[in-house]
């Protein structure tokens, strides 16, 4: 039973509970008109302390398509946060008006703090460079829908693996499925964090390797998960400029890939995926964005207990 629960980390739900969410998402995709009034009278609060396009719009569209309403802010300067209000006080106040909240915050752990003080379910919509569990649900639903299974996959993660919260959450989630293998491709300065390597991969005897060239790994991958180098995580502009074009996926590199490999990207992209890949049927990142709305519809319905 997911009613009243928070989603702060992809490990918060068991595999069985994740499957519940995915099955409901399948139903919504199949017959969306059946769910147009599921959340009549319910309100979602979107508390976005960091810029967002896809995640915020996806949450808002999800609630509106369920018949609910949305309140919130898209940057903290438009709220009492600008006056120094704490996360704890903000969520207590928002809980007086809304039935569920989605929070994005630049500080790691801020949504978890909010959940401690909240009377309504809190969804982590991304906290610093830590976790992004609803993007992970999006990724898993996309893979499950297009591949048919989440087991026995070799997943390549490429780009900013140090600050890339979507990668951290995805590795944690897929590590629970049978025979997952990982290949990490990144500049030395942006390697996967030690806590992922030691606490998730090595602790659970999950096979992984790190390579410097994309071409060295492409042939074995079932999934290639591309990420951008995030300018907003750098203190030094020179470092960003030096690293931002380290890995670029283009048609030449795709020649090494399996015919059924999937290219995913949490978006936004900068130039790490060439536009020519948009015409390749293996480029699934815009399908992935659409699945994001459906899985958030299912998640909201489950946490509110209306399904």
UniProtKB/Swiss-Prot annotation:
PANTHER family, per database record: ASPARTATE CARBAMOYLTRANSFERASE, ORNITHINE CARBAMOYLTRANSFERASE, MITOCHONDRIAL
Gene Ontology terms, MF aspect: amino acid binding; aspartate carbamoyltransferase activity
Pathway(s): Pyrimidine metabolism; UMP biosynthesis via de novo pathway; (S)-dihydroorotate from bicarbonate: step 2/3
Residues involved in carbamoyl phosphate binding: 54-55, 104, 132, 135, 267-268
Protein species of origin: Clostridium botulinum (strain 657 / Type Ba4)
Function (record text): Catalyzes the condensation of carbamoyl phosphate and aspartate to form carbamoyl aspartate and inorganic phosphate, the committed step in the de novo pyrimidine nucleotide biosynthesis pathway.
Name under which the protein is recorded: Aspartate carbamoyltransferase catalytic subunit
Residues annotated to bind L-aspartate: 83, 165, 228
GO biological process, one term: 'de novo' UMP biosynthetic process
Domain of life, per lineage: Bacteria
Pfam family, one: OTCace_N
Record lineage: Bacteria, Bacillati, Bacillota, Clostridia, Eubacteriales
Keywords, sorted A to Z: Pyrimidine biosynthesis, Transferase
InterPro entries in the cross-refs: Asp/Orn_carbamoyltranf_P-bd (IPR006132), Asp/Orn_carbamoylTrfase (IPR006130), Asp/Orn_carbamoylTrfase_sf (IPR036901), Asp_carbamoyltransf (IPR002082), Asp_carbamoyltransf_Asp/Orn-bd (IPR006131)
Enzyme class: transferase
Subunit annotation: Heterododecamer (2C3:3R2) of six catalytic PyrB chains organized as two trimers (C3), and six regulatory PyrI chains organized as three dimers (R2).
SUPFAM superfamilies given in the database record: Aspartate/ornithine carbamoyltransferase
Reaction catalyzed: carbamoyl phosphate + L-aspartate = N-carbamoyl-L-aspartate + phosphate + H(+)
Family: Belongs to the aspartate/ornithine carbamoyltransferase superfamily. ATCase family.
């Amino acid at each position: 039973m997911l009613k009243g629960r928070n989603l702060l980390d992809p490990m918060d739900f068991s595999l069985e509970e994740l499957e519940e969410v995915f099955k409901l998402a399948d139903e919504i995709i199949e017959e969306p008109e059946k769910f147009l009034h599921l959340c009549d009278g319910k309100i979602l609060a979107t508390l976005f302390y960091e810029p967002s396009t896809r995640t915020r719009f996806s949450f808002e569209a999800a609630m509106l398509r369920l018949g609910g309403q949305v309140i919130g802010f898209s940057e903290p300067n438009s709220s009492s946060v600008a006056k120094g209000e704490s996360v704890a006080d903000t969520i207590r106040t928002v809980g007086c008006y809304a039935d569920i909240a989605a929070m994005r915050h630049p500080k790691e752990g801020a949504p978890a703090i909010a959940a401690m003080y909240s009377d309504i379910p809190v969804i982590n919509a991304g906290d610093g460079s830590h976790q992004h569990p609803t993007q992970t649900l999006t990724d898993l639903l996309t893979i499950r829908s297009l591949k048919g299974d989440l087991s026995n996959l070799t997943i390549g993660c490429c780009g900013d693996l140090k600050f890339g919260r979507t990668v951290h959450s995805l590795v944690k989630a897929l590590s629970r499925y049978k025979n997952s293998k990982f290949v990490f491709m990144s500049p030395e300065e942006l390697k996967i964090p030690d806590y992922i390597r030691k606490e998730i991969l090595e602790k659970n005897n999950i096979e992984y390797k790190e390579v410097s060239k994309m071409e060295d790994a492409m042939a074995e991958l079932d999934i290639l998960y591309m990420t951008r180098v995030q300018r907003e995580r750098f203190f030094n502009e020179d470092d960003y400029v030096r690293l931002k074009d380290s890995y670029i996926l283009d048609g030449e590199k795709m020649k090494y890939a399996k015919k059924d490999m999937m290219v995913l990207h949490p978006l936004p992209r900068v130039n790490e995926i060439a536009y020519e890949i948009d015409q390749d049927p293996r480029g699934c990142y815009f399908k992935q964005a659409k699945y994001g709305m459906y899985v958030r519809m299912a998640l909201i319905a489950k946490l509110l207990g209306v399904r």
